[in-house]
């Protein structure tokens, strides 16, 4: 059968349209896979103690008598111990994709007390996402080696969470943690992200 120029043109147009539709479908699937599913905007630095009971004693060696807490409640978040000193953070912006990719940008994560207050002191940090509100908790974390905090506390993380978080993260909690392992308290947390349920 002899093919006319018009027939060839029609076949060519159909092929182009079919190819465009296929590419659009692939791009749409990829976009859904890469789409932002969880967003955190803003952060709160750790205060190591969340409650305490004051007794009638005084601080040992203090020049002025001061009450001391004989019983304190550590600020443990979903099984993760707090740092031993106060930390503050100016800003935090984090996005978690459906495929487990996470980007975190933090500003001013520095010590809020002690002899190194007002700066970071050589710590490295990583991010942990926890999706369960009650035990047992599963920690999905970036590389445990972490990224180095400069003196001003600004940092960026661009990594893959391992293990991957569940498809539905019922109660998202993002912790920024110390990469150095304490033999007693493990990888303590320095800051927590503020969850934005509307991805705003």
Predicted segment positions?
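Short amphipathic, basic-aromatic surface patches that mediate peripheral association
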Residues: 108-118
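N-terminal secretory signal peptides that target proteins for export/translocation
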Residues: 1-11
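Helix-rich interaction surfaces within compact, conserved domain-sized segments
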Residues: 33, 38, 136-200
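Short coil-to-beta strand junction motifs in C2/discoidin
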Residues: 117-125
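Bacterial N-terminal signal peptides
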Residues: 14-25
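Beta-strand signatures of extracellular beta-sandwich domains
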Residues: 126-130
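Contiguous beta-strand segments within globular domains
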Residues: 96-105
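N-terminal segment immediately downstream of the Sec signal-peptide cleavage site
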Residues: 31-90, 196-200
């Amino acid at each position: 059968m002899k093919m006319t120029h018009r027939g060839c043109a029609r076949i060519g147009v159909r092929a182009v349209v079919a190819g465009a539709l296929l590419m659009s479908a692939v791009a749409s699937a990829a976009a859904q896979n890469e789409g932002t599913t969880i967003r955190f905007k803003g952060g709160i630095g750790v205060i190591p103690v969340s409650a305490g009971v004051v007794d009638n004693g005084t601080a040992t060696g203090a020049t002025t008598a001061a009450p001391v807490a004989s019983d304190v409640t550590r600020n443990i978040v979903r099984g993760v111990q707090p740092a031993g000193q106060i930390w503050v953070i100016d800003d935090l912006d984090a996005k978690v994709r459906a495929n487990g990719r996470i980007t975190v940008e933090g500003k001013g994560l520095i010590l809020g007390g002690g002899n190194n207050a007002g700066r970071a002191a050589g710590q490295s940090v990583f991010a942990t996402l926890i999706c369960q509100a009650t035990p047992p908790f599963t920690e999905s974390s970036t590389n445990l080696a972490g990224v180095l905090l400069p003196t001003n506390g600004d940092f960026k993380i661009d990594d893959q969470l391992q293990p991957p978080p569940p498809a539905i993260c019922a109660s998202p909690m993002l912790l920024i943690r110390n990469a150095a392992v304490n033999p007693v308290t493990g990888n303590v947390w320095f800051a927590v992200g503020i969850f934005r349920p509307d991805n705003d």
